[in-house]
């Protein structure tokens, strides 16, 4: 009687990772479960880069990566997945209340007092120091002007211009 033994070495399988490209987010939105939501066909853990809570700069096609480690590393390999995400510029919130009337000949100054939720520069039309003209129509003095402001955030790569 002959006896023989054969060593059989099983090759681990690659798990299947499914990760759909996330919807566009706006700068300031931290990465979370809506973006970092890969799934696999076997139990295991996911490690994302960048990590949850990261705020990305504005820009398209930014890479998100996941390393999946299966619970059973004898039967399954560690696997990697990638998707891209687009991050749109945010729009600053500019607040400017209608100013009170001013006396004829008074240059614009404190009326030009808009604020924004991010740092930046305000450009007013008419500019500070401008004395608005008064017109007389049928004996009545009138002066109605549209005051305008353009706001440019210091971080213009992540924020839109507000007009």
Could you tell me what each predicted segment is?
Residues 1-163:
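Solvent-exposed beta-strand/loop surfaces, strongest in extracytoplasmic domains of secreted
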């Amino acid at each position: 009687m002959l006896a023989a033994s054969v060593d059989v070495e099983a090759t681990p399988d690659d798990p299947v990772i499914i990760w759909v490209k996330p919807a566009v987010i706006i700068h300031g939105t931290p990465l979370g479960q809506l973006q970092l939501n890969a799934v696999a066909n076997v139990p295991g853990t996911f490690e994302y880069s960048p990590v949850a809570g990261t705020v990305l700069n504005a820009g398209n096609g930014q890479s998100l990566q996941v390393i999946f480690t299966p619970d059973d590393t004898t039967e399954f390999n560690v696997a990697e997945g990638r998707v891209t995400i687009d991050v749109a510029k945010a729009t600053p919130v500019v607040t400017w209340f209608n100013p009170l009337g001013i006396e004829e000949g008074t240059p614009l100054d404190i009326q030009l007092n808009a604020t924004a939720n991010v740092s930046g520069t305000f450009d007013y039309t008419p500019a500070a120091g401008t004395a608005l003209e008064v017109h007389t129509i049928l004996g009545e003095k009138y002066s109605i002007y549209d005051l305008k402001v353009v706001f440019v955030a210091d971080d213009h790569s992540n924020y839109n211009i507000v007009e």
